[in-house]
Every structure is written in structure tokens, then in C-alpha cells.
Amino acid sequence: VLTKMRNREIDILVGTQMVTKGHDLPEVTLVGVIQADAALALPDFRAAERTFQLLVQVAGRAGRGALPGKVLLQTFQPEHFVIRRAIRHDVDGFLDEELVNRRELGYPPFSHLALIALDDPEEGRLQVEAMRLADVARAFTPAVEVLGPTAAPLARWKGRYRWRFLLRAKDRGKLREALVAVHRASALAHRDTRVALDIDPSHLL
């Protein structure tokens, strides 16, 4: 499809965010993004960063040749700082504003995180195990903050229920101590309960 686009055999390309990843299509002069703010609603502290990155990337697909380009964004939040900064391609302004938000909320780079994710075919058993392991981690408060446990945004996947909780600490050593304790305690979990520890998780979903 991309070859046809480059050869001018097609004029309109409809795709996912994959079309933003490094493709050089110099004849493209108009790019449209539907629901450009949708990802901002995801329960992940990196949602703003990823949305800004995507919008800047997709804007870079238009006007790469001799002709000028235009980008149209559909958004319900035109005054959101991510949308405003992306429209202006204001990387420094976005970083300044995002860092203020993260500092206020205590998210990286102003803290260290670890995600403990559990899944099990039996939801009741899973919930009990998630609470048990979270209680193990709470023995390390106040140095380590425990957020959750709660059902994951995608609460069931391939016949298995999913729960998770988050550990947050300013001291990486204290976080490591809590993780070691949780890891040891997880050895007592039911054989059908899977427990995964993710330090500095790339996503929280």
C-alpha cells in the first residue's frame, strides 16, 4: 500500500498510528487525526507524553516535499495543553508543563514505580491474592506507597481475570526491599495464579 502511495497510484491512505512511524511520503499534503485526544483518557501517567509524541509524529508526515502541508485534528479538548503544544510543535513548552504535572502528582522522574500484575481464571481467588500481596508491600510504608489493588483496565483477557497494584517510592532501595518481600510472598500463591513484577513499567494498562 505504501509503495502505491509513493507511486501516486492512490491518493488517500487510511490507517492506524503505524502510518506515523518514519514513512517518507513527500506527496502527502494533508493529514487528519480522528479523536486526537482519545488516549488522554487512558489510566496511565504517560498518556499526555504519548499523545503529544504521536501528534507531532503524524504532523511530520504532511508537507515533506515541495508543497506545504496541513494537519487537521478532531478533538473534544482543544484547550488541553497537549493539543495546544502539539499544534505549535512546542516541545520545550510541553516538557515544562508535563514535568510540573508529574512533580505535583509524584510520578517519574520524581519517583520510582513498580507494577505488580496478577491474573487467574478464578476472580475471587485472584482478588484475595492481590490484597494479600498488597498488604505485604504496605509493611514498607510510608517509604513505599501502595496504590491499589484494583482490577486492570482490561479486566479479563483470554479467560483470565487481571488485577494489579502499583508501588511508588522516592528511594529506589526501599522500593527494591518491598519488591523482594512481595516476590517471596508470591511463592505461596495458588499454582494457577500468575504474578509478574515490572520495575519502571513502560505502561500501566
Language model segments and positions:
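Glycine-rich S-adenosyl-L-methionine
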Residues: L54
